[in-house]
């Protein structure tokens, strides 16, 4: 089989699968728990966070693990909106975003944010004139 939907998900590398399987089978404590299983899970998460931080050239405390794209998009959108609320309540987005972006935008619109929905052409390119007017 040839898989063409890598925009939605991509098969992890074999070494990632092996590591993940080993951890799932042997280290299943809640990293927030005070017992030894929790400490072991927490240590592994800390190590992974440090590795990602080195790769991304950021601080480990700037790395946040989420369960997937929807949670990540919600966290990013809502976090940025809260952080920059003092700069205004206008948000510009397109009408063809993934549902994990569209839904929080609709929520923000219902909360009083001025969400500007930019049209796109048949190729998915935004209407530049509409964007400039926004």
Q: Residue spans of the language-model regions?
A:
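Pyridoxal 5′-phosphate
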Residues: 1-134
């Amino acid at each position: 089989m040839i898989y063409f939907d890598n925009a939605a998900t991509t098969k992890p590398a074999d070494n990632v699968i092996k590591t993940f399987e080993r951890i799932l089978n042997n280290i299943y404590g809640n990293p927030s728990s005070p017992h030894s299983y929790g400490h072991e899970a927490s240590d592994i998460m800390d190590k992974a966070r440090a590795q990602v931080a080195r790769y991304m050239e950021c601080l480990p405390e700037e790395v946040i693990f989420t369960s997937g794209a929807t949670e990540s998009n919600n966290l990013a959108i809502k976090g940025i909106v809260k952080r920059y609320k003092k700069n205004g309540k206008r948000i510009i987005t397109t009408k063809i975003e993934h549902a994990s972006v569209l839904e929080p935008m609709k929520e923000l619109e219902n909360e009083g944010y001025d969400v500007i929905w930019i049209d796109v052409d048949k190729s998915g390119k935004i209407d530049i004139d509409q964007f400039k007017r926004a």
